[in-house]
Amino acid sequence: MKKKIFIAGSGGIGEAAALLLREWCDFELDLILGDISQENLDKARAFVLGGSMKTTSVETVVMPREGLSGEMKAAFESCDCLLDCSPGGQAPKMAGFAKDFGMHYANLTEYVAETDKIIDLAKDASTGFILQTGLAPGFINVLAMSLYKQFVADYGNDKVERIGMKVGALTAHAHAPHFYGFTWSPIGVATEYVKSSRVIRDFEITERPALSDRETIVIGARTYEADLTSGGAADLPDYFAGKARSLDYKTLRYVGHYGWVEQQVAGLPQDERLPDLLEKLMLQAIPSVEDDLVLVHASVDGFDNHGRRRMIEKAYYVEPLEINGKRLRAIQTTTAAPLCESAIQLLRGDRKGVILQSEVDPESFMHGKFVSRVYSIL
């Protein structure tokens, strides 16, 4: 089998996805990298090719901010799948290209409005569209689905008390007063701290303010704090309404961080400028750090068919990875691996239309080459 994938966006996640696909795919796979910046493209191509023994091609295409160039049209006509690593606001545009040119499509964005547009656009598509398939949303949701299916099989009850999904992109060390270091997009962090979170309470979907339900949790004998943030639940609230008394997505941090954030937010205007103002303030106080780690924890808690309380939980701790002498940060691999896994499943299968995170097969996804290698799943 020989296939070709177009990767839109050549930043940290795009170049990581390209490297993983080229080095780990077990069939012949050519790549085209697309970006609005030729400089980004040159850097990403050098990153993917450097030190590699693979001989498959890696082409580049500059993508105009508006419209469709002849070079892009030719590239799309030659590709089987489009992986969308562009900014979330571009997702409907990229999905439209995928549908128009008969490509499969997978993306990362948690943006609700953009996701709804793609669901409408792709409902009658002749190819598959896997949405929100990064780390969170993405891997964490499939992990939760896997644990829920295991709970039902083991304990004979399909109604549960709580489903918890938690992810932390952290640093190995953290210093007072903020106990944090940026390992990914600062504006992404600021936004998830102020946008509301979609949850289930008393079996019904509702919204809660970000950072309004803090808890302390011990994972692997270390203490963390977790609180509600936006975006990570994907479509699981819709799937579990009526099945779970409580469901939420929370971001993991070192103890003390959220108290510091609350102090900063309290001194800022509570209007549409809040994400940008919080980002600016945090950038002045918090360093950006290359040495990162990603912590993932999911749990399903409920009663078995004899009325005894049970819990199934799973945690993964992911550190940076080196391939061909190139260091990939944990946030890169944990985000890119699910995207790559989705691409391979689309290319090998016959799925059509929209595939949401609750509809991904946990068994094949979790034990696929990309996800299992990055997350060390046996």
Per-region residue spans from a language model:
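Beta-loop-alpha module in the N-terminal Rossmann-like domain of NAD(P)-dependent dehydrogenases
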Residues: E71, L82-A98, V112-A113
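C-terminal catalytic/substrate-binding lobe primarily of soluble NAD(P)-dependent oxidoreductases
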Residues: Q150-L378
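Helix N-cap at the beta1-alpha1 junction of Rossmann-like dinucleotide-binding domains, i.e.
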Residues: I36-N40, V112
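Rossmann-fold NAD(P)-binding glycine/threonine-rich loop
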Residues: L108-F129
